[in-house]
Design a protein with these regions (language model features):
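Beta-strand-enriched cores of mature, soluble protein domains
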Residues: 1-168
Length: 168
């Protein structure tokens, strides 16, 4: 059905999550948690142009509100990556995580080895840069599906498989 868009594989994002900061909220029904991060990678899918092979620089934050019923998380993540050719790119994604027992287990630390399935976390990713090679990323639409990965003795990693929305 050519009237519907398709997804072209673009890249894989892996972010190591630091300990959450329970900020709270005096004016909302759902408290704010901030999860900082300073380590992670972007790796392009084969054939995707422009290739975005990069590392997170500085400290980014994922601002998260849980729905009052505890079934979903609302994400608003901000960070900066530096590509292999030294370009800086601001990355923002928003999204929703459906909390099943698998997600709850990893996010609470009850599960120390394992991963959640892809399909309970979806995001919309945008980019901003002053670098000529990557400027067209600002004009494209990207979506991702994610999962959480826990390994004993290591930080929890959130992994996204990201694709560009294209005409079929």
């Amino acid at each position: 059905m050519s009237e519907f868009p398709s997804i072209q594989p673009a890249f894989t994002i892996k972010i190591e999550l630091d300990a959450p900061l329970a900020v709270g909220s005096a004016s909302r029904n759902n408290a704010l948690q901030v999860i900082p991060f300073s380590n992670g990678t972007f790796e392009s899918a084969p054939g995707f142009e422009p290739a975005v092979d990069a590392n997170i620089v500085g400290t980014g934050n994922d601002y998260i509100h849980a729905d009052p019923d505890g079934q979903h998380l609302r994400l608003n993540c901000h960070g900066v990556i530096k590509t292999n050719d030294e370009a800086l790119i601001y990355v923002n994604y928003t999204g929703v995580v459906t909390l099943t027992d698998a997600e709850k287990g990893i996010l609470t630390g009850a599960t120390v080895d394992g991963s959640t399935p892809f399909g309970n976390s979806f995001t919309h990713i945008t980019f901003e840069t002053g670098h000529e090679r990557y400027k067209d990323l600002e004009n494209r639409v990207f979506v991702g599906k994610g999962r959480f990965v826990a390994q004993k003795g290591k930080k929890v990693v959130v992994e996204y498989r990201v694709g560009q929305v294209v005409h079929a």
